[in-house]
């Protein structure tokens, strides 16, 4: 699409030099005519209007056109525009007079304020001096920035009418500013008052904000100085409506034709170095010239035609966003330093083409609408106050919408090469700003800026190939020229495939959430402003640059494709503008239609940054690296890779452009000589870029996934890309030397030139590094990515020191300036050496010939970026697979122009799904990663500090690992050190931190892995396609030991070997093939043996290899058999010596499995056990340590005391509180098993336990073990033996000194070594105490002895037991002697000392075998005989009345003695009217407790009836009732008279419940005549001898029994008769007794409740009174009492 010519007078104000350059570069092509004139601008405006009606683009277009006019000569700009755009019409250029006027009106106040501020800061060079070299320099235009901000602000407000007025004002003001004398661009005092004046008049006539290069804030604050002409920061794409950050490939090398350009560039570089101010003054014309110089690049981006559509849509959105963002709060100024340029790091921003362009536009529209709400960084950046916005800030802050990502910010960052410290400060300050993104000019931003500055587009442009039709059409469009045409409108609109285009990776999915526009890494890192930015700064440097390049490439392709698809160039430009912004995203999903060419290898500094002005939308589209579209397909890669000779080669046949090889290759890459020859041979005429087919569906799935989540796991992305996508294209794809980390493979430094086109999706990722690649990214640790130039050596990344194009883009003298060499650590670059097959390859970077960018400008050379996976350039293997630049065994020194390329694959996300043993990972460098293997880059230090897998950290980058592994590597000093590295200190610190974290993480992961974990998991690897991935690590830069080399390919799957031969065919170098064949052999044949002599019956892989046995079912034994303990010991020793985590874990398994089955034998070596435990502790395998110690205790092979102390120390140091209980348990077991500790050891252990905050119980357990050991130690030191103690005992006996005897007992107790001796001594004491019976003294020897012993402070249960047994012996002795008083004194002493002697036995004599019943009987008898019933009962209670139990058996004599004793006690107690105690004694008579006792309980009837009678007599109704119940329950015969008396007493006492219960029991026992026969005949016979209570109870039973008949309605006439029966013996009784019985009957009826009425009816034949029970009273009683009465009387309780 063509850019519209500048409107109005702006077209005329361009320096002649620029015009001359345009003419020289111009190669008329189809549609080229419209490039420069106003007519073309009109046409473009019309298209823009159709596409951008709602965007208010026209006004902005005019404003930008005004800017561009000032920037470049009219003629030159026109030509450039014509050639660069070739029929591309920038939709944003259309101008609407009304819109301009409205914009002007609205913007006047803002412009006035901004203009004032900017005048203080900016001094514009005289407009007279045309500076063609300004292609590499961006001059910030105050006017354009103001207008740009205003337009953005207005657009965000959605005020189109106002926007138009503001635009008119802006244009007027711009014209005025152009007329103003050259201003001095001075950084704001806020940016540390760095005032910079441009030495030359290079920038006099350039518009203040030319080509939308920088965000308005950037314009205000600083000027971008492009070092080595590599960095052409691109602040904003055409019509940065969405402010999508175009990620300009900071390394794009814009070569000016004129020698004056070279001089200007040098002066700029020098001045910028001295002033540390990147000069932003670069006219759009110059940029377009660079595009011309890089015609080939356009071809690279031709393949991205499809991507252009999305880019254009993004551009539209971006433009609207920019307008809306106008008027925001000015960002803080950022001080720039020359170091910024030097520290520029490549950032290949992973580009992803959103599958659905329409969806993308929708998202953009949504994003635009939400921009004000979300406070997108763009809005913040685009504030009226002219706050400088770093390009990377936009990238970092890429808010949740595509809009938020603005290349302008990124460019600004590139432009503002500010020291990291100021950036950090500013970023922290900016965090307080609305989104925290205002301080976009953070370290990260500057890093990205820096990365932009020094990088050539070739390094960073990652090309995707669109469909062949798109490519062909695009090729035809740019067939004549890829020159960048600068519309007179000032908008930087490049041809779809022009060199200057920036390919933005757009999310094609409209459904992508705003946050989804953050590529997985970028969202996290960008949003995390508060996160330490220095970590991401490095990444940003690389990211910004990579993104820029990738955006350039993709934008070209996408724009070209869109160009064809959509006639409206408006969409194209807008989309392209949007697309570059997306490039910021860390792991963009790359549209499968496009193939990314890993151009980094050949990034010859031809990285062209499209200068996208506000209106020019195509600016962001891409920097086409190729001039001739058709030829450029293959020529770009070829040129980049092979362009090493200074002699110009004709890259574009039609244009007749020559490529300056020296300048072309800025990325110093070590290339195999044969490969270089291949690359150099032939012209690129027949070069064809293979097209990716049928990839849209799969890619869409990937895009959909990426859109669904903010953070994208590289593993997920890799997994999502199935092999189907790759298989279709693998024959046409070259294998990239770098491992592709899906999200953050910052391959800038390690740029591996060739990448499988099938991997294009990943290539972009691999080359695109978002700032979030650092810790802020997905869980990624801060790491100086290989992409960062400084990381090449300073970060010491293992992969290889790949010098970015920019790094060596200029003369070796310029190396220090090149951003790629801005090492974070400011360490001199020492020669990088790597051992390949034992041959050490070393090349000093300073010795490598670097293309001179300035010389390239002087010679007017066109720098081309080469598609590295092009089969035509690099050849195709027999299988049709692309050959890849493999590890170069030697640096091609024959061609000095070719910079040695070290592939430091910064595959941060290349997690190897391989289950590898850590050692394997450490020593194996996967050279090829087949399919989609995602290996953790396992690099190893020369010191063999092995890095373990860190699968849990998806973001672990090779850069991080490399940092760790290469710490010990000795790198040769480079001839020149990097001078201005702002990243030095901070990046150095970051590297260290990263290394530490990586070590920890890797260690944590690996310690849990077994050797079998080294196997690659096919599921994760997803060998979708047998296309070998790029080399994970290149040999040349690595100092690999032989051991490491042997296992370098260990991570390959079997599928990898399949492609090794195919790949090797591409190499003509015999040594190269030999090297890979050697690796192939290593993979196929065997794992390196550990050197153990293993019997044949055992699996040699399990025992004798690092990875172990991988066979699912192994027929060989994995555990030694019995008798082969020597094999175990040998294996343990070997594993301990190797000290590999996996081997140690295997040793644990072997140890556990073997010694669980078999006991230790003669070959068991305790030292091996100790060494194994030490090794496990060093590897933090505490669980395994506990397992082994526990097992060793079981087999009685205790570890050393030192091991135990080490375990305690480890637990205390690591604060492992949860491990303390298990450790205390092990400690106690060890002590009990015989481990001896000194008191100081105990004290130390207790101290450690306090340190770990152990509980009181745990510490007490340790102290108890201490006391036990102390006692043991004391016994060892005891001098007195048993004989001496016995002698003393006899002496005490003679003297009768029982107190001294007690002290002797205490001493013996403390000093006796054996408990048996102690028991013997105690027996002697008992005998001594019981043999003084002849002594008539009243004192009791035992009591004095017991008193002395009990006073011992250390008196324990043991002492009480000994005293109790001695006391029993004494008691029995006195019982035999019938000395009841003395025996009682002994018992009382035992009671006093609370010694439970009833459960003890005597020490001597028969008491030693006496039963418990006997001992109790003796004691009770002593009390009883001594007159103490309480004592006797106490003894019985103390013994729990136990007589004969299984636990305490006794003989019949003991039972009989107990019976007699209890009966005696009962009688004595009952005599004392102690009924309760008596009943207690009687209840425990033999026969009641145990069913085994065969004692007849009926014999106790007398005792119980006596007790019952006594209780009744004493009116103890409660006790009487209890006794009666017990007798009835135990079937003890009861006296009925006592029972009837009890019932009567209970009734009269109103205890009716118990009375009824006993009456019912009495009925059952036969105490009363049966009632059943008469109850149901309505006749009740009551004996006359019953009491009134008994009569009433009988009447109740009678009524309840006839309740049914009484309660029935018809039975009221029935009569209930009661007969007062005379007893048989009544005849002997007087009539008074019978009459008393009648009265009792009447009384019984009255005491009833309710009362009953009894009527006398008659007298029967037997002269017995007959009464009738009144029916009504009976019915009433039943109604009130039937509920309980029925339960009591009708149901039996038995």
From Swiss-Prot:
Superkingdom: Eukaryota
Biased composition (Basic and acidic residues): 95-116, 903-920
InterPro entries: TOPAZ1, TOPAZ1_dom
Pfam annotation, one family: Asp_Glu_race_2
Coiled coil spans: none
Annotated GO CC locations: cytosol
Region (Disordered): 1-135, 322-341, 600-629, 891-920
Main location: cytoplasm
Subcellular location: Cytoplasm, Cytosol
Alphabetical keyword list: Cytoplasm, Differentiation, Spermatogenesis
Ranges of compositional bias, category Gly residues: 31-40
Biological process terms in GO annotation: cell differentiation; spermatocyte division
The protein's role, per its UniProt record: Important for normal spermatogenesis and male fertility. Specifically required for progression to the post-meiotic stages of spermatocyte development. Seems to be necessary for normal expression levels of a number of testis-expressed gene transcripts, although its role in this process is unclear.
Protein name: Protein TOPAZ1
Organism: Gorilla gorilla gorilla (Western lowland gorilla)
